[in-house]
Amino acid sequence: MYEFKFADIGEGIHEGTVLQWNFKVGDKVKEGETLVIVETDKVNAELPSPVDGTIVSLGAKEGEEIHVGQIIVTIDDGTGTPAAAPAPAQVSAPTPAPAAAPQVAAPAASGDIYDFKFADIGEGIHEGTILQWNFKVGDKVKEGETLVVVETDKVNAELPSPVDGTILKLGKAEGEVIHVGETVVLIGQNGATLEQAQAPKAEAPVSEPKKGAGVVGEIEVSDDIIGGSEEVHVVATTGKVLASPVARKLASDLGVDIATIKGSGEQGRVMKDDVQNSKAPAEAQAPVQQTQAPAQAAASVAPSFAAAGKPQGDVEVVKITRLRKAVSNAMTRSKSIIPETVLMDEINVDALVNFRNEAKGLAESKGIKLTYMAFIAKAVLIALKEFPMFNASFNHDTDEVYIKKFINLGMAVDTPDGLIVPNIKNADRLSVFELASQVRSLADDTIARKISMDQQTGGTFTITNFGSAGIAFGTPVINYPELAILGIGKIDRKPWVVGNEIKIAHTLPLSLAVDHRIIDGADGGRFLMRVKELLTNPTLLLLS
């Protein structure tokens, strides 16, 4: 019997909402098949089954919340009876005991239960929402098949089954929130049943538990496998590398064999820092080390206040999505911490319009849609090199400013579910054409909710385009812990004084918000003037 629990995947996520079950009780499920889709603050996560088996029970219904550590589903994977998962407790000094000879796992007639828990993969994510189950109780599942999709603050994660077996119980229903440490699913192996899992057990000496998996995407984490009889079984480990998704991606980018890295996380899980410390240039290490300290201090600064109650009269009650809740929390945190000031200007971009029109044909021949945003981004990147304080963050606990030697340019994207701010890593190394291509693909992936957690973390400066909504000026909210954000208005045609004449010109409104604790208005004005100079003379963009 396998209890699949909702795992901690970092980024402050503690819960999720079950959106959709793909299986029902009694269904056979294969390992890796998507069991359920869970919505979290950031993503809709598909949770794959960790085992083959039959779905015995669903832990939550569609629309219900599931918390980290809660059981998503119980799967009969034919392995036997689960024991109660050990509760966290204060550990006293152990009494010395004679070393016992290694025990060999003997076949258990009643089978084993695999308790698949939602794992902590770092990034501050503590919960997620079950979006979709691909298996139901009673289904058979194969190792690697997607059990369920879980939405977290950052990604929609497909959780694959860590073992073959039968689904005995789902820890949560679609739409429910699951927390780190909660059971995602119970998977039965070797004929285990849910009744065996629920049966009281005689106390037995505790043996070394098997390392199973609580998975987000492709990440294996530790878990418990519970013996199906009163005998104590020592089960061999899976041999898979336990690692966070960010660590896996970074290892791949750096060409590091993740199997050779010693993990510092829980039960040896390889984290981002482990990969960076093994083989990473200082440039790659800086984003992690320099952005975390301010973020940790943020929570204590936000004020508390009474919530508005339900008004009297005829009202419609709408539950906000997890993404909208995440946006709400981020905006509240930023406005509570940052005393921002906003500078505005409007510039004549006739030269930029003509320059873009001349370059569009060449861009199209390369399969690139050349937008104004690519030129604006390039101008901002050049200005950030010249004004490094705008590419920094401030730790108000230590009174330290972290000036970053890399530029990860954030692009605010309006999605049907809410605002998401992914970023382009090392954007200053890209040409205008390369920026155009990346901006387009990043926006498409964000709207489709296909971006990774890595693409949503480590930003150093953000551009937001409220011109797409037909707005000229605005007061953009700084993406904490960054120190500034540039708002772009709509390009319009209006009368403009050129020399001693009034002509119709293309104009671009700019709104720059800065953290006034670190950046003064005069500095903001100089930064904005440099961006203005580059956009009114677009050939300068090619000389950088």
Swiss-Prot record:
Record's protein name: Dihydrolipoyllysine-residue acetyltransferase component of pyruvate dehydrogenase complex
InterPro entries: 2-oxoA_DH_lipoyl-BS, 2-oxoacid_DH_actylTfrase, 2-oxoacid_DH_E2_comp, Biotin_lipoyl, CAT-like_dom_sf, E3-bd_dom_sf, PSBD, Single_hybrid_motif
Annotated keywords: Acyltransferase, Lipoyl, Repeat, Transferase
Cofactor: (R)-lipoate
Cofactor annotation comment: Binds 2 lipoyl cofactors covalently.
GO MF annotation list: dihydrolipoyllysine-residue acetyltransferase activity; lipoic acid binding
Reactions mediated catalytically: N(6)-[(R)-dihydrolipoyl]-L-lysyl-[protein] + acetyl-CoA = N(6)-[(R)-S(8)-acetyldihydrolipoyl]-L-lysyl-[protein] + CoA
Active site: 516
Pfam families the UniProt entry points to: 2-oxoacid_dh, Biotin_lipoyl, E3_binding
PROSITE patterns: BIOTINYL_LIPOYL (PS50968), LIPOYL (PS00189), PSBD (PS51826)
Family stated for the protein in its record: Belongs to the 2-oxoacid dehydrogenase family.
Gene that encodes the chain: pdhC
Gene3D superfamilies: 2.40.50.100, Chloramphenicol acetyltransferase-like domain (3.30.559.10), E3-binding domain (4.10.320.10)
Location of the Lipoyl-binding domain: 1-76, 113-188
Top-level EC class as recorded in UniProt: transferase
Domain Peripheral subunit-binding (PSBD): 242-279
GO CC terms of this entry: cytoplasm
Function description: The pyruvate dehydrogenase complex catalyzes the overall conversion of pyruvate to acetyl-CoA and CO(2). It contains multiple copies of three enzymatic components: pyruvate dehydrogenase (E1), dihydrolipoamide acetyltransferase (E2) and lipoamide dehydrogenase (E3).
Modified residues (N6-lipoyllysine): 42, 154
EC number(s) stated in the UniProt entry for this protein: 2.3.1.12
Quaternary organization: Forms a 24-polypeptide structural core with octahedral symmetry.
Signal peptide: none
